[in-house]
Curated annotation (Swiss-Prot):
HAMAP family: HslO (MF_00117)
Organism for this UniProt entry: Shewanella sp. (strain W3-18-1)
Protein name listed in UniProt: 33 kDa chaperonin
Keyword NADP: no
Presence of the UniProt keyword Cytoplasm in the record: yes
One Gene Ontology cellular component: cytoplasm
Length: 286
């Protein structure tokens, strides 16, 4: 089965919506960029699944960023995405990390920043502390603060595959909290191995075979990095020309590497002259 897909579903007998995401190739492309320790491989998988699930709730075209920061050995873990379910991510850390490290062990006094940037309209940013035992619980707290709608998440990753499930009450005149609690209890019986090996139809049948579930068409999830030679040139142009020329004189070239995908962009003296002489970077040789 395709291992990089997201499904939305609705319960016809309750105002509750759900999502299920299963990732493999796109997850591996994120991990391939750096030699991440096992605990960060799992964290990035959970964060990637969470970002995909969050992205599927957006009602606009635009971008999303889910960023974890702190003063611990892991200074940053971030997944960026858009409404097309195109994701990329990276983490930065210092020293050795134990396989069973908690969020607090990794980030110290940490927090999560979720930034929504519509193609049209105002940007929204929400911040919650990383003071819960799991990433899923921290994302649930974000929804409690921002949308005030009961929300539940389940996130799994093992370094090879990542997956997640999402439930949320729909705005309604009626009280469906009891339905939500019932469906949450059913969903809580899911096992990571089931999400890694079963397709969406079988997962939903396994969990909700006594419920009326409407499953919508799958949405492909993919890895997509937004780096380019032009963007790298634009970054060089923001630096002092004398500083760039000093590096060029010493190294013979300027190299710009992308930590998201490992792409490497090299600029020689002619390129640098063009960058600073021309406001349009599109003329830089490829």
């Amino acid at each position: 089965m395709n291992q990089d897909i997201l499904h939305r579903y609705l319960f016809d007998n309750a105002d509750v919506r759900g999502e299920l995401v299963q990732l493999q190739e796109s997850y591996q492309q994120v991990l391939d960029a750096q030699a991440y320790p096992p605990v960060l491989q799992i964290l990035l998988g959970e964060l990637m699944a969470a970002t995909s699930l969050l992205t599927a709730t957006l009602k606009f075209s635009g971008d999303i960023s889910v960023q974890l920061q702190g003063n611990g050995p892991v200074s940053l873990a971030v997944i960026n995405g858009n409404n097309l379910q195109q994701l990329r991510g990276v983490a930065r850390w210092n020293g050795e990390l134990t396989d069973n490290a908690s969020l607090a062990d990794l980030f110290g006094q940490g927090y999560m920043v979720i930034t929504l940037t519509p193609d049209e309209g105002e940007r929204y940013q929400g911040v919650v502390a990383l003071d819960k035992p799991t990433l899923a619980a921290c994302v649930e707290e974000y929804f409690n603060q921002s949308e005030q709608l009961p929300t539940a998440l389940w996130l799994f990753a093992n370094g090879q595959q990542a997956a997640g499930m999402f439930l949320q009450i729909l705005p309604s005149q009626e009280d469906h909290h009891q339905d939500f609690e019932h469906l949450s209890q059913l969903t809580s019986t899911i096992k990571a191995e089931e999400l890694f090996t079963l397709d969406a139809e079988n997962v939903l049948h396994r969990l909700y075979h006594q419920e009326e579930v409407r499953l919508f068409d799958p949405i492909e999830v993919s890895f997509k990095c937004t780096c380019s030679r032009e963007r790298s040139a634009a970054a060089i142009k923001t630096l002092e020309q004398a500083e760039v020329e000093a590096i060029l004189a010493e190294e013979g070239k300027i190299e710009m590497g992308c930590e998201y995908c490992n792409a490497n962009y090299v600029f020689d003296g002619i390129d640098i002259t063009t960058i600073f002489a021309n406001g349009q970077n599109s003329n830089i040789p490829q």
